[in-house]
Amino acid sequence: VIGGQECARDSHPWQAAVYHFSDIECGGVLV
């Protein structure tokens, strides 16, 4: 992310994770 900044804790509660079996491969957050 270019020009990004930290966000306040719990301000973006919608998170996603992509699993391959039991390993997390990628993740993201809805902003």
UniProtKB/Swiss-Prot annotation:
Gene3D superfamilies: Trypsin-like serine proteases. It is an enzyme of class 3 (hydrolase). InterPro entries: Peptidase_S1_PA (IPR009003), Peptidase_S1_PA_chymotrypsin (IPR043504), Trypsin_dom (IPR001254). It catalyses: Preferential cleavage of Arg-|-Xaa bonds in small molecule substrates. Highly selective action to release kallidin (lysyl-bradykinin) from kininogen involves hydrolysis of Met-|-Xaa or Leu-|-Xaa. Glandular kallikreins cleave Met-Lys and Arg-Ser bonds in kininogen to release Lys-bradykinin. GO terms for molecular function: serine-type endopeptidase activity. Disulfide bonds: none annotated. It comes from Cavia porcellus (Guinea pig). It comes from the Eukaryota. This is Kallikrein-1. Keywords: Hydrolase, Protease, Serine protease. Its EC number is 3.4.21.35. Belongs to the peptidase S1 family. Kallikrein subfamily. One of its GO terms (biological process) is proteolysis. The keyword Iron does not apply. Residues 1-31 form the Peptidase S1 domain. Pfam families: Trypsin.
